[in-house]
């Protein structure tokens, strides 16, 4: 059966930080798909390139060039193609762009089309997106890794570490995990408000609190106090996203008002894992520190060490990390690589080498909930899409609740008391 692409149209919309982004619509005879593209605040040097307009309009952040590339360049080329040929569609766009980082047409233009095509295909076949992309084996719900306390580039405080996350590995289902996390989030808010005043419950880009805290251990202690209140000290574990490139300069790292060498930073993480129930650390070093990543992974064999800026969902960099045993997990962001098929290829490579996969949002998001479907389709162990607050974050969590409901008794949960 051939379901031809009949029309493609892009427009400029606003993301959750009030900046422009690309939204793409795709039509077939009997289906429709709409996709909106996210954007990051802390971005890796090696990511696929977002095309921005420059100039005065929207402080240079407009995306009309990318929109025109969809409407005038990409769209006409894809009209008449089979919407089910996802890899063929993606490959044509890659070839049309002709650059390693998609800087000609723009990764924001290409991803918008790629994801909208996938949605249109699912719609045309009368299937949910997770089932279309993942097949009959797409039944596992990921463990949510919720960023409840913000620092770094995601907040206006003095914390070096960018994200402090809670992960309900001990829940029996995704819905129970989300409930536990939401209860803990609100308990944390009450604790922070009582200690620091109302200003402490201002939130960062991803919905996590941004209190006037400057020390890593103070942030972790606040979260542990919240877990004591909710009683989920066994069910919920902790994760960190250091985003260490943001506090790296001239061979050293500035953490908690201290200047640390790479070796001292390794010791810092090891001590934190000994003291707190931390089971995951993302980007513990700057984006080219493959050797330091490998040393930490070796020293903490029971901890999930995740590469984000290290890999930027790029196959060549993932392969290097595999050879060097730099991490044991991949953070997968669709807009880092720019097409649906390349993202799935990256996940497949990770799984073949016994990596875990953590699907992730960006700090500037939209109401698009496709990330939830992608996480189930890929079979990801984890999903990171912010605190259980702000609608652009909860859009993903709520979609996972719907998927769990639709799957019924066939639904499974990636946690199941692994660290309890």
From Swiss-Prot:
Keywords: Cytoplasm, Glycolysis, Lyase, Magnesium, Metal-binding, Secreted. Binds a second Mg(2+) ion via substrate during catalysis. GO terms for molecular function: magnesium ion binding; phosphopyruvate hydratase activity. The active site is at 206 (proton donor), 333 (proton acceptor). It comes from the Archaea. (2R)-2-phosphoglycerate binds at residues 162, 333, 362-363, 384. One of its GO terms (cellular component) is extracellular region. It is an enzyme of class 4 (lyase). The keyword Nucleotide-binding does not apply. It catalyses: (2R)-2-phosphoglycerate = phosphoenolpyruvate + H2O. Pfam families: Enolase_C, Enolase_N. It is found in: Cytoplasm; Secreted; Cell surface. InterPro entries: Enolase (IPR000941), Enolase-like_C_sf (IPR036849), Enolase-like_N (IPR029017), Enolase_C (IPR020810), Enolase_CS (IPR020809), Enolase_N (IPR020811). GO terms for biological process: glycolytic process. Its cofactor is Mg(2+). Pathway: Carbohydrate degradation; glycolysis; pyruvate from D-glyceraldehyde 3-phosphate: step 4/5. Mg(2+) binds at residues 241, 282, 308. PROSITE patterns: ENOLASE. HAMAP family: Enolase (MF_00318). Belongs to the enolase family. This is Enolase.
């Amino acid at each position: 059966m051939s379901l031809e692409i009949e029309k493609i149209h892009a427009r400029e919309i606003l993301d959750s930080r009030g900046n422009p982004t690309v939204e793409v619509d795709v039509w077939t005879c009997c289906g429709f798909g709409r996709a909106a593209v996210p954007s990051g605040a802390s971005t890796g040097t090696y990511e696929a390139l977002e095309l921005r307009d420059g100039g005065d309009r929207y402080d240079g952040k407009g995306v009309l060039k990318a929109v025109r590339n969809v409407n005038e360049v990409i769209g006409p080329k894809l009209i008449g193609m089979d919407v089910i040929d996802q890899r063929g569609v993606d490959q044509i766009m890659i070839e049309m762009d002709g650059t390693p980082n998609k800087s000609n047409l723009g990764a924001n233009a290409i991803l918008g089309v790629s994801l909208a095509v996938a949605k249109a295909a699912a719609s045309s076949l009368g299937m949910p997106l997770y089932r279309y992309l993942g097949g009959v084996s797409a039944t596992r719900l990921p463990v949510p890794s919720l960023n409840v306390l913000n620092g770094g580039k995601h907040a206006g405080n003095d914390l070096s570490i960018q994200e402090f996350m809670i992960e309900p590995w001990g829940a029996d289902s995704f819905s129970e995990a989300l409930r536990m996390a939401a209860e803990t989030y609100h308990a944390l808010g009450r604790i922070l408000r009582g200690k620091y005043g109302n200003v402490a419950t201002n939130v960062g880009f991803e919905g996590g609190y941004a209190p006037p805290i400057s020390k890593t251990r103070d942030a972790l202690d606040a979260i542990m106090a919240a877990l004591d209140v909710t009683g989920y000290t066994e069910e919920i574990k902790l994760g960190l996203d250091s985003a260490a490139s943001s506090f790296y300069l001239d061979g050293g790292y500035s953490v908690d008002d201290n200047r640390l060498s790479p070796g001292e930073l390794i010791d810092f993480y090891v001590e934190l894992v000994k003291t707190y129930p931390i089971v995951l650390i993302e980007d513990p070093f700057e984006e080219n520190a493959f050797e330091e990543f490998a040393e930490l992974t070796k020293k903490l064999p029971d901890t999930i060490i995740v590469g984000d800026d290290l890999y930027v969902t790029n196959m060549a960099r993932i392969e290097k990390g595999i050879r060097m045993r730099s991490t044991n997990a991949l953070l997968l962001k669709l807009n880092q690589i720019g097409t649906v098929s390349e993202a799935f290829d990256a996940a497949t490579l990770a799984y073949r080498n016994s990596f875990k996969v953590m699907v992730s949002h960006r700090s500037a998001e939209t109401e698009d909930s496709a990330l939830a479907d992608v996480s189930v389709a890929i079979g990801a162990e984890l999903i990171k899409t912010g605190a259980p607050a702000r609608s652009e974050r909860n859009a993903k969590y709520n979609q996972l609740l719907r998927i769990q409901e639709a799957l019924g008794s066939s639904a499974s949960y990636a946690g199941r008391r692994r660290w309890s």
